[in-house]
Regions:
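Membrane-embedded transmembrane helical bundles of large multi-pass transporters/channels
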Residues: 1-37, 136-381, 486, 496-691
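Structured non-transmembrane domains adjacent to transmembrane bundles in polytopic membrane proteins
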Residues: 47-67, 72-162, 378-379, 384-546, ...
C-alpha cells in the first residue's frame, strides 16, 4: 500500500481511529499506574562487577541489604533502648545494632571497648546502625524508612542511601505530574503565538499526549523504569515529536492550496508527505537513542528503549490520530486563525546568505573555547547533591558528618577462614589509611568487660557466618571525591593482601565503579551516535561531504551548550553530557536535514548557490523556529521548577540546547553551504540538474 492510499484510509476511518485511540488510554493508564519506578541509579551498574556481587552476598548470606545510621539526640538510655525495640519490630528491619546489643544498659559505658564507644556516641547523643533485609531501593526498605520516621521524634535523624532514595521518591512523585502540566501549558502558549491558529496547539498536545500515555503505559512490560526516565520521558517525547505535528500541519496547508480546498484529499496527501519526510528525521532521532543502549551502565538502556518507543508511537500518532483530530475540528481551527508572531523570515534569509562570512568567522572563533569548555565541565556523581538541602535524609547526613565525622561507610566481606589475628592486623592497617575514621569487626566488639561468649548470637550472626565475616569501615571523605576513590584503592590493596577474594562494598565503592564505567560508556555512546548519524546522512543525501559538514555543525552546537557550564562554574550531574548530547544531536539533525533537503531540491531544480540557499533558509527557518521555541518552552519551565537538580539541570540544558541549535542551524549551517557549495555539489548525488 502506498502512503497516499494509507492517508485516504486514515481520512475515511477518522472517527473509528479517534474512538480506538481514546479506548486505548484505559489499559495504557493502568499500565502507567502499575509500573514500578526505581529511584536508585546505582542499581543500573553491571551485575558482574565485584561491588554488585558483594551486595547480593550480603542479602543472600547475611540477610542484610541496606543499612542506615540512626542518630538520637538528648534521650535517656532507657528511652533509646525502648525506641530501638520498636524499630526492630518494623517490617523489613533485620537488626538494630547499639550499645545494648552488646551489654545491658546498666553496665557503665566506660567498660565498652573505647573504639566501639567512640563510634556510637557523640557529645550530643548516640547512634545506632539499622540493617534492613532488602536492598537499598526496594519497596520494603522504603516502607520501613517511612515507618521508622513516624516512630522517631524531632531529635532523631535517619541517614544513609536508603533514606536519600526514599526522599527522592517522595519528591519525584509530588513533582512529576507538574512537569507535564508546565511543559504542556508553556508549549501551547508558544505554539499558539508562532502558528497561525490558536486551536491547533491543543490538538497537537492531545495527540502527542495520547502517544505519551501509550509510551508510559507500555513500560509496564519492562517491570520497572528509572525515576529519571519517568520524569523526562513525557517532556522529551513532547519536544522530540512536536516537529512531526508541525510538519503535518504545514503540509496540510500546502495541499489545501494544491487541491483547491478539498480538505480530505489534501489531508491524505499531507499524511503521505509527512510520513515520507518524518521517516528520515525519526530514524536519526531513534539512532541517537539506540546509541544509549550500548552503555554497560543500563540506565542508558532504560532511557534509550523508552524514548525509541516514544518516537515510534509519536510518528504513528502524527499520521493517524492528529489528522483525524484536525479534520474533525476544522471549524474551530478556522475560527481561531491569526497571523503568527514571528519575525520576517525573508529579511533574515537574505541577510544570512549575504553576510555568511561573519557567521563562519564567529563559528571559528567560538569553536575552540566551546571544545575546551565541553571537555573541562565539572560533573558530580554523588546522588545527594541532586536534592534540596532541607530534606530529612540530607539533614541527617550533614549531622552524621558534623557530630560523628562520618561521611561514607564501607562494608568489607572477608572469608570466615581468615584467622582473627590476621583480621586484627588488617583492621590496624586500614585504620592508618588516610581518611579512615575507624574500622570495626566482631573482634573489635570484644573487650575486657565483654568476652566473645557474652555477645548475643544475633549480633555474632549479623557479623559472621560459615562463609564470610563482615567489617565496617568509616571514612571522613565524601562519596565520589578523588580522596575517597584513592582511599578505596588503598583499602582494596590491604584487603586483598589478607584475602584475595575479599570484597569492599557500599555506596562509595559502587560510585567509584560508576565513575569508571560511565567514563568508558560515554565515549562509546558518543562515537556510536556520531557514527550512526554520519552513516544515515551519507545514505540519505548520497553525499561524502554533507555528513562531515552537518555532523561538524551539530557537534559545534552541542559543544557550545555543554561548554557554557565550565565558564559559569556550574557542576552538572554525571549523566548530563550523554543524555543532552543524544537529545540535542537528534533535534539538531532534524533541523539540519529539513534545511539541507530543501537546499538539495533547489540546486537540483537549477537554482544557483545563493538563490538555492536563500530559498531553503526561507522555507525551513519558520518550522525550525517554531519547533525550537516550543521545545525551549516545554523544558525551561520544568528546569526552573524542579527541586531535583538532576531533572532541573537536564531540562535547562535541553532548553538552552534548543535555542543554540536553532541559532546554529539558522545562521551557521547556511553559511557553511555558501562556503562549501562547490565541494557539496561535486561530492553529492542529485544536487545538480540531470543533463
Amino acid at each position: 500500500m502506498n502512503m497516499v492510499a494509507f492517508g485516504k484510509k486514515v481520512v475515511k476511518f477518522r472517527i473509528p481511529i479517534l474512538i480506538i485511540s481514546i479506548l486505548l488510554l484505559i489499559p495504557a493508564g493502568l499500565g502507567y499506574v502499575n509500573t514500578r519506578v526505581n529511584y536508585d541509579v546505582l542499581t543500573y551498574l553491571p551485575e558482574d562487577i565485584e561491588t554488585m556481587q558483594g551486595q547480593d552476598i550480603l542479602v543472600k548470606d547475611f540477610g542484610t541489604g541496606a543499612f542506615s545510621m540512626f542518630i538520637v539526640d538528648g534521650m535517656e538510655d532507657k528511652e533509646v533502648s525502648a525506641l530501638k525495640a520498636k524499630i526492630e519490630n518494623v517490617e523489613h528491619v533485620q537488626k538494630v545494632l547499639w550499645y545494648d546489643s552488646l551489654a545491658d544498659i546498666s553496665m557503665p559505658k566506660s567498660m565498652i571497648p573505647k573504639d566501639v564507644y567512640e563510634v556510637f556516641n557523640s557529645d550530643t547523643g548516640t547512634m545506632m546502625a539499622i540493617f534492613f533485609d532488602e536492598g537499598t531501593s526496594s519497596d520494603g526498605t522504603m516502607e520501613a524508612i517511612g515507618k521508622i520516621r513516624k516512630l522517631a521524634g524531632k531529635q532523631c535523624f535517619l541517614s544513609g542511601m536508603s533514606a536519600i532514595v526514599t526522599d527522592t521518591k517522595n519528591l519525584a512523585e509530588k513533582e512529576t505530574p507538574l512537569y507535564v502540566l508546565i511543559a504542556v501549558v508553556l508549549a501551547v502558549i508558544v505554539l499558539g503565538l508562532t502558528m497561525d491558529s490558536y486551536f491547533i496547539p491543543l490538538l497537537f498536545m492531545l495527540s502527542i499526549g495520547m502517544a505519551i500515555v501509550y509510551n508510559l503505559g507500555s513500560n509496564y512490560f519492562f517491570g520497572e523504569i528509572s525515576y529519571i526516565t519517568k520524569a523526562l520521558a513525557a517532556v522529551l517525547q513532547l519536544g522530540v515529536t512536536l516537529d512531526y505535528s508541525i510538519f503535518l500541519m504545514h503540509s496540510y496547508e500546502e495541499q489545501q492550496v494544491r487541491y483547491n480546498g478539498d480538505k480530505e484529499r489534501a489531508m491524505a496527501h499531507a499524511i503521505s508527505q509527512t510520513f515520507s519526510s518524518v521517516i528520515g528525521s525519526s530514524v536519526t532521532t531513534v539512532a541517537g537513542f539506540i546509541a544509549l543502549c550500548f552503555m554497560t551502565f543500563t540506565l542508558g538502556m532504560d532511557i534509550g528503549v523508552v524514548m525509541v518507543k516514544g518516537v515510534i508511537l509519536g510518528v504513528i500518532a502524527c499520521v493517524t490520530i492528529l489528522p483525524s483530530m484536525i479534520l474533525c475540528c476544522d471549524k474551530w481551527i478556522m475560527k481561531t486563525m491569526h497571523k503568527p508572531f514571528l519575525p520576517d523570515i525573508g529579511k533574515i534569509s537574505d541577510k544570512v546568505t549575504k553576510r555568511y562570512m561573519i557567521y563562519v568567522i564567529l563559528f571559528l572563533v567560538l569553536l575552540f573555547p566551546a571544545i575546551y569548555g565541553n571537555n573541562h565541565t565539572a560533573v558530580y556523581y554523588n546522588l545527594d547533591e541532586t536534592l534540596p538541602k532541607d530534606l530529612p535524609s540530607i539533614i541527617a547526613n550533614e549531622k552524621l558528618k558534623k557530630d560523628y565525622d562520618m561521611n561514607t561507610t564501607h562494608m568489607i566481606l572477608v572469608d570466615s577462614s581468615v584467622e582473627s589475628a590476621d583480621v586484627a592486623k588488617m583492621i590496624d592497617k586500614m585504620d592508618d589509611v588516610d581518611g579512615v575514621k575507624w574500622a570495626l569487626g566482631l573482634d573489635a566488639l570484644i573487650g575486657p568487660a565483654i568476652p566473645q561468649d557474652m555477645i548475643p548470637n544475633s549480633v555474632t550472626d549479623m557479623l559472621k557466618n560459615d562463609k564470610y565475616q563482615l567489617l565496617l569501615v568509616n571514612s571522613e571523605y565524601k562519596v565520589a571525591s578523588d580522596e575517597l576513590n584513592a582511599q578505596i584503592k588503598d583499602l582494596n590493596k590491604i584487603l586483598h593482601k589478607y584475602d584475595k577474594g575479599g570484597m569492599l562494598i557500599g555506596g562509595g565503592p559502587l560510585t567509584a565503579d560508576l565513575i569508571d564505567i560511565t567514563d568508558t560508556d560515554f565515549k562509546t555512546v558518543s562515537m556510536v551516535s556520531i557514527g550512526i548519524i554520519f552513516v544515515i546522512i551519507l545514505i540519505l543525501f548520497k553525499s561524502i561531504s554533507l555528513p562531515v559538514i552537518l555532523v561538524g555543525v551539530i557537534e559545534f552546537a552541542i559543544f557550545v551548550n555543554m561548554g557554557i557550564p565550565y565558564y559559569t562554574g556550574t557542576k552538572l550531574p554525571f549523566v548530563a553530557s550523554i543524555i543532552i548530547g543524544t537529545i540535542q544531536l537528534g533535534s539538531t539533525v532534524d533541523y539540519a536535514i529539513l534545511m539541507t533537503t530543501r537546499y538539495k531540491r533547489e540546486r537540483n531544480h537549477g537554482a544557483e548557490k545563493y538563490d538555492a540557499i536563500t530559498t531553503a533558509h526561507r522555507a525551513s527557518a519558520q518550522s525550525i523556529m517554531v519547533s525550537a521555541l516550543s521545545f525551549f518552552a516545554a523544558t525551561i519551565g520544568v528546569g526552573l521548577y524542579s527541586n531535583i537538580d538532576m531533572i532541573s539541570s537536564l531540562c535547562i540544558l535541553m532548553a538552552r540546547g534548543a535555542i543554540i541549535s536553532m541559532i546554529v542551524v539558522i545562521f551557521v549551517l547556511p553559511s557553511m553551504f555558501m562556503v562549501f557549495d562547490k565541494v557539496i555539489v561535486k561530492t553529492s548525488k542529485g544536487f545538480l540538474p540531470a543533463k
